[in-house]
Amino acid sequence: MAGNFWQSSHYLQWILDKQDLLKERQKDLKFLSEEEYWKLQIFFTNVIQALGEHLKLRQQVIATATVYFKRFYARYSLKSIDPVLMAPTCVFLASKVEEFGVVSNTRLIAAATSVLKTRFSYAFPKEFPYRMNHILECEFYLLELMDCCLIVYHPYRPLLQYVQDMGQEDMLLPLAWRIVNDTYRTDLCLLYPPFMIALACLHVACVVQQKDARQWFAELSVDMEKILEIIRVILKLYEQWKNFDERKEMATILSKMPKPKPPPNSEGEQGPNGSQNSSYSQS
C-alpha cells in the first residue's frame, strides 16, 4: 500500500500545503469566521455520512465522497457550487469509483430528499431542490477539478496493520476506527498521508484506553512531530464539536455562507460555460 501511495495522484497532487489551503479559503472567510467554517465542515461531513448510511454504502465509499467534497472546496469558494448539490454528487461519484455499484438516479434523489427532510430539516426547511441533471453537471465540474485523480487512500488499512502489529486489536481498533471517521470532519485528509493519520488516531486511542504504547511508537521511523500536529487537530475538533449545537447554529451559519450568484435572468439560468443552473458561479 505504502509503495503505491507514494506514486499515486493522492500523494503527488492532493497532499496540500496548509498555507495554500488557508489562502484559497480567504474568500469564504470574508463571510464566515474560522470557527463557523469549521462547523460547516463538520455539518456537511455529517450530511454525506447520513446520505451514505441511507444508501447503505460502505464506510470507505462515504470517506472517499468526503475527500472529494473537501478537495473541491480546497480549490474553489463555497459560492462556486452549492454544497447541498456537491454532497450527493460526491456520494454518487465515490460509489462508482469504489466499485460499490452505481447508485440509481431515483435512489440518489430520493435519499437526498429524505435525509434533508428527516435529519436536517432544522437547517433546510425547503425540499431538496436539485434533480439528476444537476448532479451529472456538477459531477463534470468535480471531475474536471480533480483532473480525474479519483483513487483515494484512507487510514483504515494502515490502522488495521498497526493495531495487529501492536497485538491489541480488540482493545484499540473500534475506538481508533471511530477517531479516523471523525478526522474527515477536518482538513487532515488534505494535509497528511493516511498512514500518519492512522498513527495519530491510534495514539489518541491508546491514551483514552490507558494503553502504554510509548515503546511501540518509539521504534517507528516516523516524524513524531507531524503525528503530534495531527493529534492537536483531532483534539481541537473534539473541543469544538462538544460546544457545537447544530440544531441551534446551522441555520444562521448557512444564511451567512456565500452562495452562487443568481443569474440576471431567472428564465435562462446561465452558469459557467453556459450551464443552465443557478447553483454554479465562476467568481
From Swiss-Prot:
Gene Ontology MF term list:
cyclin-dependent protein serine/threonine kinase regulator activity; identical protein binding
Matching Pfam families: Cyclin_C_2, Cyclin_N
Gene Ontology CC entries for this record: CKM complex; cyclin-dependent protein kinase holoenzyme complex; mediator complex; nucleoplasm; nucleus
Localization in the cell: Nucleus
| Keyword Nucleotide-binding on entry | no
The entry's function note states:
Component of the Mediator complex, a coactivator involved in regulated gene transcription of nearly all RNA polymerase II-dependent genes. Mediator functions as a bridge to convey information from gene-specific regulatory proteins to the basal RNA polymerase II transcription machinery. Mediator is recruited to promoters by direct interactions with regulatory proteins and serves as a scaffold for the assembly of a functional preinitiation complex with RNA polymerase II and the general transcription factors.
Protein name stated in the entry: Cyclin-C
Give the originating organism.
Answer: Homo sapiens
